[in-house]
Amino acid sequence: MQESKEQRVHGVFEKIYKNYDQMNSVISFQQHKKWRDKTMQIMNVKEGAKALDVCCGTADWTIALAEAAGKSGEIKGLDFSKNMLSIGEKKVKEGGYSQIELLHGNAMELPFADDSFDFVTIGFGLRNVPDYLTVLKEMRRVVKPGGQVVCLETSQPEMFGFRQAYFLYFKYIMPFFGKMFAKSYKEYSWLQESAREFPGMKELARLFEEAGLTNVKYHSFTGGVAATHIGWK
């Protein structure tokens, strides 16, 4: 019986959780932190904000949201991998982030009421869900009117030559790094597949609009290897 995408992805993240943060830095050459910082600048999260970080993983973006919102903020992080959440819980406890609550759950069926959050984010997680549009619609449902839905994700470079080099890197070098640093060649081979199949910037912007979001904008990083998309409700 063939594994579903959801089962396969769950297995990947349950296995690579211990080395996930290190591998993010290796694979992106530390750029993922700069991309997130720039995205946070664009979002302009205010003191006391309520935010949800979907597919929060080890909670790096969740913590960034908490630092921006301050002690009066209310931040939720949700992920379907208990092992990834265990790393996040340790960070939250060590940092004393009392405004953060991490939850085990499914991005396809968010366990929150309509119009609950000022910001709903997803970082390097949308490409791994079974249905992109369903998750975007769920994110729109739980964000407040006037709130932002934000996705930071790998993208598809458009410049000839660089695009080909990018896909060669993802196909051959990234799995090699996975084997060398995390002993997880198979799992990182899957992650390059998910990145290759993920929509480009214009197509993802169209999906944001199809999900009912308005004034959709996107910002390209590092020649198009990643992008932030923001839409309003």
Curated annotation (Swiss-Prot):
CDD domains recorded: AdoMet_MTases
Family assignment from sequence similarity: Belongs to the class I-like SAM-binding methyltransferase superfamily. MenG/UbiE family.
One GO-annotated biological process of the protein: menaquinone biosynthetic process
Function recorded in the entry: Methyltransferase required for the conversion of demethylmenaquinol (DMKH2) to menaquinol (MKH2).
Catalytic activity entry: a 2-demethylmenaquinol + S-adenosyl-L-methionine = a menaquinol + S-adenosyl-L-homocysteine + H(+)
Pathway terms, separated by semicolons: Quinol/quinone metabolism; menaquinone biosynthesis; menaquinol from 1,4-dihydroxy-2-naphthoate: step 2/2
Keyword Transferase tagged: yes
Membrane-crossing segments per the record: none
PANTHER family the UniProt entry points to: 2-METHOXY-6-POLYPRENYL-1,4-BENZOQUINOL METHYLASE, MITOCHONDRIAL (PTHR43591:SF24), METHYLTRANSFERASE (PTHR43591)
GO molecular function per UniProt: demethylmenaquinone methyltransferase activity
Binding site for S-adenosyl-L-methionine: 58, 79, 106-107
PROSITE patterns assigned: SAM_MT_UBIE (PS51608), UBIE_1 (PS01183), UBIE_2 (PS01184)
SUPFAM superfamilies, A to Z: S-adenosyl-L-methionine-dependent methyltransferases (SSF53335)
Pfam family, one: Ubie_methyltran
Superkingdom: Bacteria
Keyword Cell inner membrane recorded: no
Organism ancestry: Bacteria, Bacillati, Bacillota, Bacilli, Bacillales
Name this polypeptide is given: Demethylmenaquinone methyltransferase
Enzyme class: transferase
Keywords: Menaquinone biosynthesis, Methyltransferase, S-adenosyl-L-methionine, Transferase
Gene for this chain: menG
Its EC number(s): 2.1.1.163
Gene3D superfamilies, alphabetized: Vaccinia Virus protein VP39
